[in-house]
Amino acid sequence: MNMQTSTVMAPPAPKTLAQMQLPLAMMRDILIKSMFRMNANLVTEMSRVICLPVNVVQELVDLCRQQRLIEATGTLNANSGNEMGYQLTDQGKARAQDALKQSEYFGAMPVPLDIYREQIKRQSIRNIAITRDQLSNAMGHLILPPALLGNLGPAVGAG
């Protein structure tokens, strides 16, 4: 529909691992599974794959390096923008494969449930009243039976 909706701000991006409010082991496993499956070797690539800011991913990479799951490979080439490259160690590959046996999920880092709930509340349309004129304007480009808008209005308003 072409209706204008109120602007709802997204929750702020986390600035640290602690702000993620997720277990470190889970975040670590999602990172190494994503590196393993997507062949992501640069922090900027990892950031894009797991959908977290670069500084948070770097913090996670540093944690994995301390656990000897990831090692630095140096700068890859001129195309990497002199960004440090990383790869899984043998121990990291084994951990990634073991983690994949437990759960095939990799990619975007999950959002903590309480943050998700708060965002859903902010996006709720329960207190938004939609008039027949607004609905007609939004659906004006469609050819619909006149009675349909009367039935559709309450359904749209109910969310």
Predicted regions and their residues:
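Short alpha-helical segments that sit at the start of domains
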Residues: 5-30
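The C-terminal cap of the DNA-recognition helix in HTH/winged-HTH DNA-binding domains
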Residues: 37, 65-66, 157
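Dynamic helix-loop-helix/coil hinge segments at AAA+ ATPase domain boundaries and subdomain interfaces
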Residues: 121-149
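Short amphipathic alpha-helical elements of helix-turn-helix/winged-helix folds
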Residues: 30-38
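Short acidic, hydrophobic short linear motifs in intrinsically disordered regions
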Residues: 37-49
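Pre-Walker A (Motif I) flank of P-loop NTPase domains
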Residues: 147, 158-159
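Interdomain "pre-motor" coupling segment immediately N-terminal to P-loop NTPase/helicase cores
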Residues: 63-128
